[in-house]
From Swiss-Prot:
Part of the 30S ribosomal subunit. Contacts proteins S8 and S17. May interact with IF1 in the 30S initiation complex. GO terms for biological process: translation. GO terms for cellular component: small ribosomal subunit. Pfam families: Ribosom_S12_S23. It comes from Lysinibacillus sphaericus (strain C3-41). This is Small ribosomal subunit protein uS12. The gene is rpsL.
């Protein structure tokens, strides 16, 4: 326990929390060609690679991912949620934060139903998370 005199000389320092999605906390000034401190909830990007990867130890699957170059020139790996997708190289996608626990280095999700990404076909529950329109009522 420090003395009051020690605290007067050097006060306690508050902990600095590190961002879990750092690519969303940078903007880009194309005139100066420099990064700026503009935070945003989502960012647009172009797919440079689309593929599958295997998850960490207890799980087994082929998880779909895309390598995306964002508008701030940062390249990130993003997860493609849902069953089936229409993404390929040069597709324009919207990225949000949120990591995938069993994929190493994947800190972002692609938003389904936005820009070039289609919603999940035949989905009836949790439709808003997968960009699926409400099905037509049968008479």
């Amino acid at each position: 326990m420090p003395t009051i005199n020690q605290l007067v000389r050097k006060p306690r320092q508050s902990k600095i929390t590190k961002s879990k999605s750092p690519a969303l906390n940078k903007g880009y000034n194309s005139f100066k060609k420099s990064l700026t401190d503009v935070k945003s909830p989502q960012k647009r990007g172009v797919c440079t690679r689309v593929g599958t990867m295997t998850p960490r130890k207890p799980n087994s699957a082929l998880r779909k991912y895309a390598r995306v170059r964002l508008t701030n020139q940062i390249e990130v790996t993003a997860y493609i949620p849902g069953e089936g997708h229409n993404l390929q190289e040069h597709s324009v996608v919207l990225i949000r934060g949120g990591r995938v626990k069993d994929l190493a280095g994947v800190r972002y999700h692609i938003v389904r139903g936005a820009l070039d990404t289609a919603g999940v076909n035949g989905r009836l529950q949790s439709r808003s998370k997968y960009g699926t329109k409400r099905p037509k009522e049968k008479k």
